[in-house]
Amino acid sequence: MQSNGTGQEQNHPANTQNGDANGLQSNAGSASGASGTGSGSLKKKKRLSQAEEDVIRLIGQHLHGLGLNQTVDLLMQESGCRLEHSSATKFRNHVMEGEWDKAENDLNELKALMHSPNAIVRMKFLLLQQKYLEYLEDGKVLEALQVLRGELTPLKYNTDRIHVLSGYLMCSHAEDLKAKAEWEGKGAGSRCRLLDKLQTYLPPSVMLPPRRLQTLLRQAVELQRDRCLYHNTKLDSSLDSVSLLLDHVCSRKQFPCYTQQILTEHCNEVWFCKFSNDGTKLATGSKDTTVIIWQVEPDTHQLKLLRTLEGHAYGVSYLAWSPDDVYLIACGPDDCSELWLWNVQTGELRTKMSQSHEDSLTSVAWNPDGKRFVTGGQRGQFYQCDLDGNLLESWEGVRVQCLWCMGDGRTVLASDTHQRIRGYSFEDLTDRNIVQEDHPIMSFTVSKNGRLALLNVATQGVHLWDLQDRVLVRKYQGVTQGFYTIHSCFGGHNEDFIASGSEDHKVYIWHKRSELPIVELTGHTRTVNCVSWNPCIPSLMASASDDGTVRIWGPAPFLDAQELDGLTESCSSMDS
């Protein structure tokens, strides 16, 4: 521990299916009665609501895509619905058969059914473009030229595209044409894609948007995923990896809230931990003056001691991996004037940097090019150096608490003793205020996309800021934060989660959108100084504590139901 004096839910798919089945059953009864002798038992045909008609059309479109055309015909006949307007059906068939003149005539019939008649020009342009490309592929250059000059150009639409199309006349063979036009060639594939574009101009009452049912199902699954507190994996957008028969729910047992390992090799307080950018290693720094590099086993995700980096004159309070993970820089506490730059692969010290014995170098950040880094401390030092420790630039009078290099390679963010984060440019020596807090900023980190900053604020806890809009987005509740330096992190799939240590010996995890913690992790017996989430393994997390241990957190072990019920693991849910 380091002291510092500064709506509504989506309908279940099964429910929708039952509703449709009931509606169809009613119509089926009518059909059965109609086929009889006209007796008094003839059932009155149910009048379908607009929503019911829409669902039947969606099902019909989906079945048609599966090739179940007879089933579609029976469904439309029995329900009394129409899958699409008869003019749209003709238009579809003519496009798929490549009968371009007939398809163009069909547009005249569809014009009266469209909300925007001007869209006819755009649709005609797309039709003629396909016609032109198919002529070129067939080697019919004269016919293609006639389409270009006599049909496309008179439309006076998208002249830039016409100039591009004219250049395809110079293609020597069909493969050259396909490559330059980024077009797959004449056939069902390109015509289907053309039809998808054309359908966007037609109202859904005339022709449904392409694959509409799949789109709705995908949206429903994505919404369920977004509402799932513990969702920490990537979903396949094809829907093949999910069940549509049940709502999507992730179990807490799949979340990294169970102790997998307790690393006890340090012999004093552990102040910092950080996974490498490729997720294959973990570096831990301790008050015992050592840095330990741990190897993450790819199959088991167990950590094994790789090497110990020794020789530091002070405890190690901060670590920074180079972008390529070849080097690691170690910093000490306030009274440390040295930086240690290690080659992690060989275990050799490359540079021990010190500008003055009066310096305080407590924070460091790598430039994205991996050839430079910035460092500073609360005594007013703010340097940019190369890999050999040579001073490249300096900024006077900035009392640095924490540093971060932005992805543009020019801007450096620095929190200072004035309770703010400012952006500095060493190129033109300009700076600007980005974040202003009312209490000291003990540490901060930035999301991968550079948009969000996560701050640990003295006596306040964890705050989320939008760096682009320069606004406070959220204050996360639960954590105990005094004037000790605690490091939080983004993590999980798509960085949807936030984790932080706490002075009450716990690790807190929040979903990024929720102020209340979803999980509290207990097990440490003293302040938890730092949490690091593996950037490549969403289910792996590490925490470093003043109790001298590093805990590795992962999903629940494979236990049977009885064992899981009796598991005395230190993971408690905070959702309500």
Swiss-Prot record:
Example of a GO biological process term: proteasome-mediated ubiquitin-dependent protein catabolic process
Primary site of residence: cytoplasm
Start-end of Low complexity biased regions: 21-34
Segments for region (Disordered): 1-46
GO cellular component, as recorded: GID complex; mitochondrion; nucleus
InterPro entries recorded: CTLH_C (IPR006595), G-protein_beta_WD-40_rep (IPR020472), LisH (IPR006594), TPL_SMU1_LisH-like (IPR054532), WD40/YVTN_repeat-like_dom_sf (IPR015943), WD40_repeat_dom_sf (IPR036322), WD40_rpt (IPR001680), WD_repeat-ST_regulator (IPR051350)
Modified residues (Phosphoserine): S49
Domain CTLH: 84-143
Subunit-level organization: Forms homooligomers. Identified in the CTLH complex that contains at least MAEA, RMND5A (or alternatively its paralog RMND5B), GID8, WDR26, and RANBP9 and/or RANBP10. Interacts with DDB1-CUL4A/B E3 ligase complexes.
Biological role stated in the UniProt entry: G-beta-like protein involved in cell signal transduction. Acts as a negative regulator in MAPK signaling pathway. Functions as a scaffolding protein to promote G beta:gamma-mediated PLCB2 plasma membrane translocation and subsequent activation in leukocytes. Core component of the CTLH E3 ubiquitin-protein ligase complex that mediates ubiquitination and subsequent proteasomal degradation of target proteins.
Name of protein: WD repeat-containing protein 26
Species this chain originates from: Danio rerio
